[in-house]
Design a protein with these regions (language model features):
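Conserved N-terminal phosphate-binding loop of PLP-dependent enzymes in the Aspartate aminotransferase
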Residues: 1-127
Length: 127
C-alpha cells in the first residue's frame, strides 16, 4: 500500500522552530550524558526508596526503571501520602489508591535525592 498526498501529515511536522527545538533538546541530552546520569542515579534512588520501605511496614513494594519509580502501600492511603508529601514540599503522583509515583528530573543529583527522600520519610511518619 502506498501513501498518496494528504494521507499522512502533521500540522507542525517539519516546522523550522520545532525542528530546531528538537535538535537543541537532543543535543543537550547527548552533550550532558543525561542517559548516563539516569543510569547512575537509578540504583541510588531505588535504594533510598527501599530504605524507606524498611522503615515503614505499610510500604509493600518499591519498583522502577530509570528514574521513574513507584511505591505501593498495604492499603488505599496514597491520597494521605500525597497530601503529607505536598506539605513537605514534594510533588508526587498517585496513579492508584495504594500507589505513589516519582518522576524526578533526569539531571537530579544525589543530594537532591537525599533531600527528597528525607522529606518523604517525614511525610510517611505522619501517616
Amino acid at each position: 500500500m502506498a501513501l498518496v498526498p494528504g494521507d499522512h501529515g502533521s500540522t507542525f511536522g517539519g516546522n523550522m522552530l520545532t525542528t530546531a527545538a528538537s535538535y537543541a533538546g537532543t543535543k543537550f541530552l547527548i552533550d550532558n550524558d543525561i542517559p548516563g546520569q539516569v543510569k547512575d542515579m537509578e540504583p541510588y534512588l531505588l535504594g533510598a526508596l527501599n530504605d524507606l520501605k524498611g522503615r515503614f511496614s505499610f510500604v509493600t513494594e518499591v519498583r522502577g526503571k530509570g528514574l521513574l519509580a513507584a511505591m505501593d502501600f498495604d492499603s488505599d492511603i496514597s491520597g494521605q501520602v500525597l497530601t503529607a508529601a505536598n506539605e513537605a514540599g514534594i510533588l508526587l503522583n498517585g496513579p492508584r489508591p495504594h500507589t505513589i509515583r516519582f518522576m524526578p528530573p533526569l539531571n537530579i543529583t544525589r543530594e537532591e535525592i537525599d533531600e527528597g527522600v528525607d522529606r518523604l520519610g517525614s511525610a510517611l511518619a505522619t501517616i
